[in-house]
Amino acid sequence: MSAREGEKRSGVIEEFGFPAEVIQIIGRTGVTGEVTQVRVRILEGRDKGRILTRNVIGPVRIGDILILRETEREARKLSGRR
C-alpha cells in the first residue's frame, strides 16, 4: 500500500468514525437504566489499541463493533447509589 492510499484510507475512517469492539459490559446507568456503560478497544485510527469507557443506548453485547465519532471523551465511572 502506498502512502497516498494510506492517507485516503485513514481519511475515510475518520470521516465515518472509529470502529471499537466491546470487551466488557460495566453496568446500566441513566434515570431508568436505558444506557449501558461498556469498555471498548479501538480497532483502527490513531488511538488503535486504546481502551475507553463509553455509554451506549440500545442493545449491546460483548464482541459487538461500535462506530465512535471520536475517541477523546471517556464516560464518567459509575458510582454507587446514594
Curated annotation (Swiss-Prot):
Alphabetical list of CDD domains matching this protein: S1_S28E
An example molecular function term from Gene Ontology annotations: structural constituent of ribosome
GO CC annotation: cytosolic small ribosomal subunit
SUPFAM superfamilies on file: Nucleic acid-binding proteins
InterPro entries: NA-bd_OB-fold (IPR012340), Ribosomal_eS28 (IPR000289), Ribosomal_eS28_CS (IPR028626)
Keywords: Ribonucleoprotein, Ribosomal protein
Family designation: Belongs to the eukaryotic ribosomal protein eS28 family.
Name of this chain's protein: Small ribosomal subunit protein eS28
Organism: Aeropyrum pernix (strain ATCC 700893 / DSM 11879 / JCM 9820 / NBRC 100138 / K1)
